[in-house]
Amino acid sequence: MSSKANHAKTVICGIINVTPDSFSDGGQFFALEQALQQARKLIAEGASMLDIGGESTRPGSSYVEIEEEIQRVVPVIKAIRKESDVLISIDTWKSQVAEAALAAGADLVNDITGLMGDEKMPHVVAEARAQVVIMFNPVMARPQHPSSLIFPHFGFGQAFTEEELADFETLPIEELMEAFFERALARAAEAGIAPENILLDPGIGFGLTKKENLLLLRDLDKLHQKGYPIFLGVSRKRFVINILEENGFEVNPETELGFRNRDTASAHVTSIAARQGVEVVRVHDVASHRMAVEIASAIRLADEAENLDLKQYK
């Protein structure tokens, strides 16, 4: 994937959480057969990539042992790969899980610690010549920030010195993201990860205030200027739901309307992202997000559009 002159439609990456305590689907796809059925559904609806995760990263979630995480994700990856050539991403920050997943058929590592959580991860990615999503993780950069305290600890040990953490606390969010990516990309280069195999994720929803989330989304073009494709996850994020609540919309996921509103609002954000040329969006409800991508991409790629043959509508 290249971020230069992006003349392709935004890729839709469908989410499959094989966890008993997942962020928004309640562990619905924890069982192998259910996960495989969900994969088929997402592909049929238009996903050309699937993101498989075996450890929840939601606020209040618990650490999953490496072997347990491997047992959750590897059978699912093998089963999907057996019947489809869809791109498969493994959502993990642990190098041993990534190694097992890549061996099972995954193509890409989605590391929410941005290569900062496990020092062996850059080498695993480099050796496999795999692609990697490097996510900006404000929770790691500002662990004492009020927006970070509700999240679990990410990574083995501490990625930054106490002096760095103290400096990070007062940085504007754009500067903090720049500092984080500078360190993460240096690790990638040192390990020998090819630049063309790197995607950047602005970390929407991780230890950010409402304003910070909105600023990063508004300025995605600035992130594109770094020369890497963008991988974006905004589906069912809390700040999107909060905006709906503040404006009187039903958001209770136990109601049909509330659940639908969450996905509709998320799809609106996807439309904005696709209009800005974001390369990949990570979503739960592929059908609604595909519609958003098709319209937004058509507008963005208007110069390449063909005129309709109106005779076909007679």
Curated annotation (Swiss-Prot):
Domain called Pterin-binding: residue spans: 10-294
Pathway: Cofactor biosynthesis; tetrahydrofolate biosynthesis; 7,8-dihydrofolate from 2-amino-4-hydroxy-6-hydroxymethyl-7,8-dihydropteridine diphosphate and 4-aminobenzoate: step 1/2
Binding-site residues for Mg(2+), renumbered to this chain: N17
GO molecular function: dihydropteroate synthase activity; metal ion binding
Essential cofactor(s): Mg(2+)
InterPro entries on file: DHP_synth-like, DHP_synth_dom, Dihydropteroate_synth-like_sf, Pterin-binding_dom
Entry's EC annotation: 2.5.1.15
Residues reported to bind (7,8-dihydropterin-6-yl)methyl diphosphate: D91, N110, D201, K237, R282, V283, H284
UniProt entry keywords in alphabetical sequence: Antibiotic resistance, Folate biosynthesis, Magnesium, Metal-binding, Transferase
Top class in the EC scheme: transferase
Transmembrane stretches, start-end: none
A cellular-component GO term for this protein: cytosol
Regulation: Is potently inhibited by sulfonamides, with Ki values between 25 nM and 850 nM.
Function summary: Catalyzes the condensation of para-aminobenzoate (pABA) with 6-hydroxymethyl-7,8-dihydropterin diphosphate (DHPt-PP) to form 7,8-dihydropteroate, the immediate precursor of folate derivatives. Is the target for the sulfonamide group of antimicrobial drugs. Sulfonamide drugs act as pABA analogs, they inhibit the reaction by acting as alternative substrates, leading to a 'dead end' sulfa-pterin product.
Note: Reaction proceeds via an ordered binding mechanism, with DHPPP binding to the enzyme first, inducing a structural change which forms the pABA-binding site. One or two residue insertions within this gene are responsible for sulfonamide resistance in streptococcal clinical isolates. Sulfonamide-resistance mutations in the second loop region have a drastic effect on pABA binding.
Subunit text: Homodimer.
Name of the protein: Dihydropteroate synthase
Species this protein is from: Streptococcus pneumoniae (strain ATCC BAA-255 / R6)
Name of the coding gene: sulA
